[in-house]
């Protein structure tokens, strides 16, 4: 195994001359001594400062009264990351019901979760003010609707203010309430009014929408509290509820809150901390709402902790950024936040084709919450609605949100809401569909056993017409495919069974080109296209052709995995991905522009897995380059391990029979690597990849001295620096 480490000279943070850590024991406190624990925390901080993109001052809004960026906050406070070695690794979502047997247990658990959230996630919020004063500033009629503008005054010397607008329909009350937080969603409130709700808008929202954020002044009003921007918006919602509780028109049993995108995040925070809110419809809040931090990491190509705290450092408490790349160490996740809403009504909803959305992530949250709602005797109070389309909503979406609220508020007794799954996989469902049980003896061909029984298929090229017309469907228009560029061109390539790939080429092609087959990670909502333009341009600039397509269950094929095991119960999703990749090799090799002796498989995360398993069966790839792609399945500790294949992503369900006893697993990655043989291979294994047991991985790789192993001092990220390792390695194969 040829190794290279990238420790480098890390940024030295000369920030810590005088440090006071206000957090609990997990965060640690620094007293200037250089003991081992302090060194660990300092090294963790140096790593963050060295590898993460520096945060940016918010375009609107503030972190607090002093800091514009996360780095400024860290320097001023001197806070350090927690002692990660003392925190348990929880690669799967936290089980919020662990140890909960009674209602009293659940009350204690909720208090524990809220304490965790106030420290790590949103900051400490002030208690409810007891001196609310109401000033009606205007009343008018819009048609038959009474519109009342109100200013709430509260807090020290009544210096806190919050403006509301109340839309009251001409209906005898008391009425259910539809609460939202900025005038851009006024049509949502208007739709609710048409459906018999009292509409309420409170003006605590991002000023980017053109309206003042009343909650920004809470920073100076409550200087002893460090609640973040989204928490300030959510706290403002509770002040609106304070007022609503004084109105005879309001039915206190039925107060719903909703919001879209960043406003969905604050709606969840509001409801998690205020149990007077009895229903929540957070629309496409995604990361920081229902898409859990453990499933928004770089391999999922959505919005990671690094990304969201870089662009929006004020949304959450700055301590959250400490967990970038170490999401498994978070003592909570968004399912914990959402569990605080139970047993009240909650609809999880997003588009499964929007950049930051994820059918997989939302479904995992939904499934994690179902036992909570069942424990609390309200299994019907949680819903899942995944829609197609871009991030913005339509009028029909809002009507469907109100349909859910009508059901929740007993206004539609004859209606029920059926969860809409897109991925829809569970290991238990697969067992029932396949009828399989643990193998009584080890299979002779371990790799084919794991991949399952591939059905007989017509090989490519078949005796079809010369010009085969294929389409990836309407979603490729949403993704802007093929990717547009002035430095490369593209042509469609049919392959396999009615599938379409895009072949990217230099604008001027001279001779036969080496081919890179680009295999994407777990990018459920966008497939191969998000963030692919820059590396494709670099590869074509260096003289490569690049073939890219969506794996089954991702991007334009996101809907194709749901019924896969009903159709092919003895096969596997990874087996299908391998078959499609082999078909893509065949199709590309038939092109006059491709040098079939120089075909390389390149993959990150899931794509690396597909590359390795494909090469294990197919001798045609000349080389394989993989980034953060696997960990030994028999011996790894503290990772998703077998569960990632069998229970989470449904890639190799048969492995699930060995999840509780991994040492007996019939096949592991040493078998895969041996099957690939002596072909050229690059493995990039970041030192801080939370998905890998680094010590177990390096022990395995010692048995393969011909593999080129690069070990950047980084988390599991597909950064430009990591991509350049691949590009340079590819160039080295041409020398």
Question: What name fits each language-model region?
Answer:
Residues 1, 20-51, 650-653:
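C-terminal segment of N-terminal export signals and the immediately downstream linker at the start
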Residues 5-27:
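N-terminal export signals
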Residues 158-161, 168-177, 498, 507-515:
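Proline/glycine-enriched tight loop/beta-turn segments at coil->beta junctions
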Residues 162-164, 189-192, 210-214, 269-270, ...:
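Short, solvent-exposed loop/turn and secondary-structure capping segments
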């Amino acid at each position: 195994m040829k190794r290279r480490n990238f420790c480098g000279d890390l940024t030295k943070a000369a920030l810590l001359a005088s440090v006071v850590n206000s957090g609990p024991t997990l965060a640690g406190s620094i007293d200037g001594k250089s003991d081992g624990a302090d060194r660990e925390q300092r090294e963790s901080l140096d790593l963050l400062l060295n590898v993460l993109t520096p945060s940016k001052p918010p375009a609107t809004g503030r972190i607090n009264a002093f800091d514009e960026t996360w780095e400024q906050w860290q320097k001023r406070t001197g806070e350090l990351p927690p002692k990660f070695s003392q925190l348990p690794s929880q690669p799967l979502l936290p089980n919020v019901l662990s140890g909960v047997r009674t209602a009293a247990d659940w009350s204690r658990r909720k208090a524990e979760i809220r304490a965790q959230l106030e420290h790590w996630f949103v900051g400490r919020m002030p208690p409810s003010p007891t001196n609310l004063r109401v000033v009606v500033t205007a009343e008018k009629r819009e048609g038959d609707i009474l519109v009342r503008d109100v200013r709430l005054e509260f807090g020290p010397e009544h210096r806190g203010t919050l403006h509301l607008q109340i839309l009251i329909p001409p209906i005898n009350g008391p009425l259910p309430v539809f609460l939202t937080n900025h005038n851009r969603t006024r049509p949502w409130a208007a739709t609710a009014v048409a459906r018999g709700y009292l509409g309420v808008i409170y003006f605590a929202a991002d000023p980017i929408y053109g309206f003042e954020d009343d909650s920004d002044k809470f920073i100076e009003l409550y200087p002893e509290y460090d609640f973040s921007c989204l928490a300030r918006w959510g706290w403002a919602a509770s002040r609106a509820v304070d007022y609503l509780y004084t109105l005879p028109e309001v039915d206190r049993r039925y107060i719903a809150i909703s919001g879209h995108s960043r406003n969905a995040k604050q709606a969840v925070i509001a409801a998690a901390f205020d149990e007077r809110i009895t229903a929540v419809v957070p629309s496409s809040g995604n990361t920081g709402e229902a898409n859990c931090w453990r499933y928004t990491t770089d391999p999922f190509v959505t919005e990671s902790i690094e990304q969201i705290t870089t662009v929006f450092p004020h949304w959450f408490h700055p301590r959250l950024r400490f967990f970038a790349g170490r999401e498994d160490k978070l003592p909570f996740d968004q399912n914990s936040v959402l569990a605080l809403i139970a047993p009240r009504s909650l609809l999880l909803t997003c588009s499964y084709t929007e950049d930051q959305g994820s059918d997989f992530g939302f479904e995992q949250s939904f499934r994690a919450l179902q036992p909570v709602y069942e424990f609390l005797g309200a299994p019907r109070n949680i819903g899942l609605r995944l829609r197609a389309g871009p991030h913005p909503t339509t009028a029909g979406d809002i009507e469907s949100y109100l349909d859910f609220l009508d059901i929740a508020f007993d206004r539609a007794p004859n209606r029920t809401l059926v969860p809409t799954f897109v991925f829809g996989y569970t290991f238990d469902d697969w067992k029932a569909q396949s009828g399989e049980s643990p193998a009584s003896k080890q299979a002779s061909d371990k790799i084919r056993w794991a991949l399952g029984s591939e059905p007989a298929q017509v090989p490519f090229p078949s005796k079809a017409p010369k010009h085969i017309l294929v389409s990836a469907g309407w979603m490729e228009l949403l993704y802007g495919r093929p990717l547009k560029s002035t430095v490369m061109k593209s042509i469609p390539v049919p392959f396999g069974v009615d599938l379409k790939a895009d072949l990217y080429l230099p604008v001027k092609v001279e001779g036969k080109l080496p081919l890179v087959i680009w295999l994407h990670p777990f990018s459920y909502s966008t497939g191969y296209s998000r963030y692919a333009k820059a590396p494709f341009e670099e590869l074509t600039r260096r003289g490569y052709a690049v073939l890219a397509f969506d794996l089954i269950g991702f991007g334009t094929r996101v809907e194709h995995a749901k019924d896969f095991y009903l159709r092919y119960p003895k096969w596997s999703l990874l087996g299908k991905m391998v078959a499609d990749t082999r078909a893509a090799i065949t199709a590309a090799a038939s092109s006059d522009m491709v040098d079939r002796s120089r075909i390389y498989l390149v993959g990150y995360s899931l794509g690396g897995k597909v590359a390795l398993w494909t090469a294990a069966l197919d001798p045609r790839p000349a080389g394989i380059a993989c980034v953060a792609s696997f960990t030994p399945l028999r011996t790894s500790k503290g990772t998703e391990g077998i569960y990632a294949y069998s229970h989470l992503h449904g890639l190799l369900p048969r492995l699930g029979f060995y999840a509780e006893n991994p040492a007996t697993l019939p096949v592991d990655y040493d078998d895969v690597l041996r099957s690939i043989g002596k072909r050229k291979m690059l493995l990039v294994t970041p030192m801080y990849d939370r998905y890998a047991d680094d010590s177990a991985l390096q022990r395995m790789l010692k048995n393969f001295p011909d593999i080129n192993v690069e070990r950047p001092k980084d988390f599991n990220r597909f950064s430009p620096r990591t991509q350049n390792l691949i590009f340079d390695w590819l160039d080295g194969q041409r020398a």
